[in-house]
Amino acid sequence: MARYTGPSCRLCRRENTELFLKGERCYTDKCAIKRRNYPPGQHGQGRTKTSDYGVQLREKQKVRRIYGILENQFRGYFERADRLKGVTGENLLFLLERRLDNIAYRLGFASSRIEARQLVRHGHFTLNGRKVTIPSIQVKAGDVLELREKSRKVACINESLEAVVRRGIPQWLELDKGAYKGAVKTLPAREDITMPIQEQLIVELYSK
């Protein structure tokens, strides 16, 4: 499945929730879902009855779009989560949260996960002192993500760091803004993931 390249705000309206795909715009009145809180398209404002399968599918699509994961990748994460000890749905969210690009976003180095992924791929970060370019790396407790010296004057990164106070930093992460580095204090717990996600619906979908 190809990566979606259309309007990001259209996806938020389709999933009827804020996916925070457009950075700081999502925190303003310009957010599309605040202005037009109904699905896109000619029949977007019409009433529709959604089947159980449709509800499960929409939840999967919502989570996949939040983290910017392709379908095959997402299924791979689910299969891995299913093999781990614990609750499959929660394991899935933990794996997604521990992606390096998500950590860069959560710490405030980028205004969106898409931007964070680009920064990682372009070699702007080191992980535990080593340059990294793979967004899907799974971080662990104690890992330190640092912006490389040559990247510290990039305007969009500094703007994101200044604005991170608005959305906050998860308790399981720690940011030293002055040193352009952040640390993974501990692995995330379910209560740390505050987005409106019903992961059990995804488990039900893939269990069919």
From Swiss-Prot:
Protein name (database record): Small ribosomal subunit protein uS4
GO annotation, biological process: ribosomal small subunit biogenesis; translation
Signal sequence interval, chain numbering: none
Primary role: One of the primary rRNA binding proteins, it binds directly to 16S rRNA where it nucleates assembly of the body of the 30S subunit.
Record carries keyword rRNA-binding: yes
HAMAP family hit by this protein: Ribosomal_uS4_B
Gene: rpsD
Protein keywords: Ribonucleoprotein, Ribosomal protein, RNA-binding, rRNA-binding
One MF annotation (Gene Ontology) recorded for this entry: structural constituent of ribosome
Record text on subunit structure and interactions: Part of the 30S ribosomal subunit. Contacts protein S5. The interaction surface between S4 and S5 is involved in control of translational fidelity.
CDD domains: S4
Domain S4 RNA-binding: start-end pairs: 98-158
UniProt superkingdom: Bacteria
Entries under InterPro entries matching the protein: Ribosomal_uS4 (IPR022801), Ribosomal_uS4_bac-type (IPR005709), Ribosomal_uS4_N (IPR001912), S4_RNA-bd (IPR002942), S4_RNA-bd_sf (IPR036986)
Family per record: Belongs to the universal ribosomal protein uS4 family.
Cystine bridges: none
PROSITE patterns from the UniProt entry: S4
Keyword Zinc in annotation: no
One GO CC term, this protein: small ribosomal subunit
